[in-house]
């Protein structure tokens, strides 16, 4: 069962401005990644459902976060059907992120009052997801749509909260483009939690990178 309400999850996304996301098939390494991000100031994390036994690793992460990382909100991404969403909910997921909009996922998450974010790539998809209660839409693929898309939809849809995933990098200019366009937060994957960092187990570098990126985002949000 989720430890955090959908309101608490949304609030954390809005306040931090960044949702780190990753997948790794080893529980021990995944815990160290989560801890490094936590030590860097992150209080929300998306574990992507992209490999064999991902649910087992996720379950270990949730238990670890509850026991050792107070205030860390862990959710799941890359969910493509209601059955998978239900399995992760039972494992303690605090939110669900999908690459596409699906009514079955929306219904099961709403039934349990769990925060969910649907992957959308058009204003029609965004409007439909919001009709089903989606508070924050995942803009995907962000590298294809770009900040200009966000700025354009904010005209007719100023109430829409957006989290782009893909196409978001650590560079100041890139982050500035996204936040100037009106995003609520950004999803940050391999640009933040790189293969090199994982391979070399350079968790201190990950901590420092998370800390620096959060500070950059905070400064950009304050200037708006």
Language-model features: locations:
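Conserved N-terminal beta1-alpha1 strand-loop-helix module at the mouth
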Residues: 1-74, 79-83, 87-91, 200-222
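Generic hydrophobic/aromatic pocket-lining and core-packing "Φ" positions
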Residues: 34, 58, 85, 106, ...
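Catalytic cores of alpha/beta
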Residues: 81-91, 124-132, 169-186
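Glycine-rich phosphate-binding active-site loops on the catalytic face of alpha/beta enzymes
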Residues: 43, 95-105, 139-146, 182-203
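Glycine-enriched alpha-helix->loop->beta-strand junction motifs that scaffold or abut catalytic
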Residues: 41-43, 68, 89-96, 110-117, ...
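Glycine/Thr-rich beta-alpha phosphate-binding loop at enzyme active sites
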Residues: 43-51, 84, 89-91, 112, ...
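Generic structural signal for hydrophobic
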Residues: 36-37, 61, 88, 109, ...
């Amino acid at each position: 069962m989720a430890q955090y309400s959908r309101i608490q999850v949304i609030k954390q996304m809005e306040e931090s401005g960044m949702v780190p996301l990753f997948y790794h098939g080893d529980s021990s390494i995944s815990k160290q990644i989560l801890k490094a991000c936590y030590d860097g100031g992150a209080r929300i994390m998306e574990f992507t459902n992209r490999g064999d036994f991902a649910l087992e690793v996720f379950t270990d992460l949730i238990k670890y976060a509850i026991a050792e990382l107070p205030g860390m909100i862990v959710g799941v991404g890359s969910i493509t059907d209601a059955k998978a969403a239900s399995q992760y909910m039972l494992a303690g997921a605090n939110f669900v992120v999908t690459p596409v909009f699906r009514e079955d996922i929306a219904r099961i998450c709403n039934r349990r009052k769990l925060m969910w974010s649907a992957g959308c790539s058009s204003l029609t998809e965004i409007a439909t997801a919001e009709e089903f209660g989606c508070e924050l839409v995942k803009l995907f693929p962000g590298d294809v749509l770009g900040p200009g898309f966000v700025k354009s939809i904010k005209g007719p849809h100023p109430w829409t909260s957006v989290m782009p995933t893909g196409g978001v990098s650590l560079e100041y200019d890139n982050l500035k483009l996204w936040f100037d366009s009106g995003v609520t937060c950004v999803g940050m994957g391999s640009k933040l939690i790189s293969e090199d960092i994982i391979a070399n187990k350079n968790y201190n570098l990950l901590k420092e990178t998370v800390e620096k990126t959060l500070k950059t985002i905070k400064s950009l949000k304050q200037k708006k």
